[in-house]
Amino acid sequence: FLRAIELDPEYASAYGAAAWCHVWRKVNGWMQDRPAEIAEGERLARLAVACGRDDAVALTRGGHALGHLARDLDGGIALIDRALLLNPNFAPAWFLGGFLRIFHGETESAMALLSHAVRLSPLDPEMFRMQAGIALAQFFAGEYDAAASWAEKALGNLPTLLVGAVIAAASHALAGRPEPARHYVARVRVLDPTLCQASLAEWLPIHRAQDLARLAEGLRAAGLE
């Protein structure tokens, strides 16, 4: 993507995709210099939006990156809503918009967006993201059995998906199943040894205190310090 930007400094979608790479690094615990990488992701996301006011791809990836990295959930949601007006058949806008609404505390509307994305693109190569999003929404809604099931589906498609392992662990724990909860916590420790209850607020831009507390409670019950 950086090479594409070098060749075309106004290539909005390339800025958005490059920004989104920083989101992916953050959610998987891969960042080496978190403040610098977050700042660079924000910079790229803002360029995506500035260059791509009529580009659904740029608005989707850039908007989601701003919601996640800059924690501007309202702004990110508005940008993705514009992307959906431009291209209502763009599945990533549906599921990434769903993620931002989850973080904003709008689990019901998030579920509607994510479910639509699944129907719109049932063989999507990013299906694991949709499944993880549904798992997260179900978890914050208190539907722990459904959350665990969807998290395990996501892990079936991408076994190294950190958020899938986290939600599986917390869901099983709060549903009273300690053995699978411990199994998934062990996977969390392998995927990101630095993740702990105290770092959850930095890891995901969860807006509502009760949602953050629920996730911390589940992971504590699963055995994560």
Predicted regions: what they are:
Residues A14, L123, T194-L195, E225:
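A general structural signal for well-ordered secondary-structure junctions
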